[in-house]
From Swiss-Prot:
The lineage of its organism: Eukaryota, Viridiplantae, Streptophyta, Embryophyta, Tracheophyta. Oligomer (believed to be a pentamer but probably hexamer). One of its GO terms (cellular component) is apoplast. Plays a role in broad-spectrum disease resistance. Probably has no oxalate oxidase activity even if the active site is conserved. Member of the 12 germin-like protein gene cluster located on chromosome 8 in the major-effect quantitative trait loci (QTL) for fungal blast resistance. Partial suppression of the 12 germin-like protein genes increases susceptibility to the fungal pathogens causing rice blast and sheath blight diseases. SUPFAM superfamilies: RmlC-like cupins. Transmembrane segments: none annotated. One of its GO terms (molecular function) is manganese ion binding. Residues 1-23 form the signal peptide. It comes from Oryza sativa subsp. japonica. Gene3D superfamilies: Jelly Rolls. This is Germin-like protein 8-12. The keyword Transferase does not apply.
Length: 224
């Protein structure tokens, strides 16, 4: 009996640990917690608005996700985020959205979302998409068309590119965090402020110092 009890206790501890590991955002402990953006309280997320002051408008956002965005930039893409910063009703719900517009041959460059898995749906056009795993860095990529869905696992480097030379493309992403965050690899490495030592980058990328200096001198434009 004692051994059975110990086995059960061990199994419960493993299950509890597993649940803690796989959880991205903390699970809500109440029906909702609309973010109070003016609260002086600092927590992991946002303090709750008084439930008595919450209305239907707190769960609505006129995002205009049906409207094309301006893709006139070096990357030829535009990401419109709808996370807790724009939509306080998402607080504690563990979800956010993004609309991604691509100019012909536009690219959403390699980046990561440190706090979220991303589920991308192609609304218009044809995209080349992919992600790279942790070491030894295997690439999983595919050409996806209108109506197709592709998932990028949490914190993996991933990208999308519009393959059409003449037509724009549009996608929409659901992300498993109210605030997924984004780190664009190229601009993070070569455009950080203050800059990373060129000695570090020269050795890391195994190229000449003048190439690193040139890369660091560029204007690294974002698409969001």
């Amino acid at each position: 009996m004692a051994s059975s009890s110990l086995f059960l206790l061990g199994a419960l501890l493993v299950l509890a640990s597993w649940q803690a590991i796989v959880a991205y955002d903390p699970s809500p402990l109440q029906d909702f917690c609309v973010a109070d953006m003016n609260s002086p309280v600092r927590v992991n997320g946002f303090a709750c608005k008084n439930p008595m002051d919450v209305s239907s408008e707190d769960f609505f956002n006129a995002a205009k996700f049906d409207m094309p965005r301006n893709t006139f930039n070096k990357l030829g893409s535009n990401v419109t985020n709808l996370n807790v910063m724009e939509f306080p009703g998402l607080n504690t719900l563990g979800i956010s959205l993004a609309r991604i517009d691509y100019a012909p041959m536009g690219v959403n460059p390699p980046h990561i979302h440190p706090r979220a898995t991303e589920l991308l749906t192609v609304l218009e056009g044809t995209l080349y998409v992919g992600f790279v795993t942790s070491n030894p860095n295997k690439l999983f990529s595919k050409v996806v068309c209108k109506g197709d869905v592709f998932v990028f696992p949490k914190a993996m480097i991933h990208f999308q590119m519009n393959l059409d030379h003449d037509k724009p493309a549009v996608a929409q992403s659901a992300l498993s965090s109210q605030n997924p965050g984004v780190i664009t690899i190229a601009s993070a490495v070569f455009g950080s402020q203050p800059p990373i030592s060129d000695d570090v980058l020269t050795k890391a990328f195994q190229v000449e110092k003048k190439l690193i200096d040139w890369l660091q001198s560029q204007f690294w434009e974002n698409n969001y």
